[in-house]
């Protein structure tokens, strides 16, 4: 038996999942704790392994989100996954949080991702390019695109300007919560493994200085 481990600390708390990767009917177990901190990651993994009936030695691949996200969350998540992979027993894959979220759409290659960075500013992934831009720039970018889906967080889903935009362009909205992390497994074929990963700690205030 072989398992893939998915870890996301770029959003609220910790989300973690185990997927059996070499079975016709794979076992899958996920744990989400929006109040969890980095020091609880080991306990969450132990609980997942026990519930799945797996051992750490059976985990052969680890995927971790690299942000954008909070400094403390990303730092602990990346360090935790690097520690798990340091022995060389498992490969470590780092992926952009926005790239990972795009996998929640039925057709990731035809999806944009919009999540809140701060008031009136958003992180946008469109055509494999990621940006930190204002609301009016999101509107302009998506109006000139041909996306069929937009993966959004709760803030984007409730923003009146963006809601009107999504309706105008005829794109189906997909909320970024409640979807299985196993949807990210397709990214194993798109990114190269590395024992060292660099998270996107850059804060929105940095990007504002560039405009």
Predicted segments with their positions:
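Oxyanion-binding and handling regions
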Residues: 1-25, 38, 93-211
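Stable alpha-helical structural segments in soluble proteins, enriched in small hydrophobic residues
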Residues: 48-52, 81, 87, 178-190
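DPxDG-like acidic metal-binding loop motif
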Residues: 61-92
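Generic recognition of short, well-ordered alpha-helical segments
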Residues: 40, 75-79, 161
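Surface loop/turn motifs at the tips and blade-to-blade linkers of beta-strand repeat domains
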Residues: 31-32
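Buried hydrophobic packing segments
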Residues: 45, 80-84, 102
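Short, well-ordered amphipathic alpha-helical segments that serve as non-catalytic structural scaffolds
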Residues: 37-52, 98
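Phosphate/pyrophosphate-binding loops at sites that engage ATP/ADP/AMP, CoA/4′-phosphopantetheine
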Residues: 45-61, 138-147
């Amino acid at each position: 038996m072989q398992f893939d481990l998915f870890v996301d600390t770029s959003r609220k708390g910790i989300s973690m999942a185990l997927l059996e990767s070499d079975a016709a009917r794979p076992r899958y177990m996920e744990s989400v704790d929006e109040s969890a901190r980095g020091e609880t990651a080991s306990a969450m993994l132990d609980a997942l392994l026990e519930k799945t009936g797996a051992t750490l030695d059976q985990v052969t691949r680890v995927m971790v989100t690299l942000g954008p996200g909070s400094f403390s969350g990303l730092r602990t998540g990346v360090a935790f996954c690097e520690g798990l992979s340091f022995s060389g027993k498992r490969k470590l894959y780092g992926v952009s949080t926005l790239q990972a979220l795009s996998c929640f759409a039925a057709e990731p290659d035809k999806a944009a991702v919009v999540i809140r960075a701060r008031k009136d500013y958003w992180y946008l992934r469109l055509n494999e390019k990621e940006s930190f831009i204002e609301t009016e720039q999101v509107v302009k970018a998506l109006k000139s695109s041909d996306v069929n889906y937009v993966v959004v967080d709760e803030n984007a889903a409730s923003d009146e300007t963006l809601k009107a935009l999504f309706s105008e362009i005829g794109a189906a909205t997909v909320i970024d919560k409640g979807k299985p992390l196993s949807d990210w497994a397709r990214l194993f074929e798109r990114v190269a493994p590395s024992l060292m990963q660099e998270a996107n700690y850059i804060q929105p205030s940095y990007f504002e200085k560039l405009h």
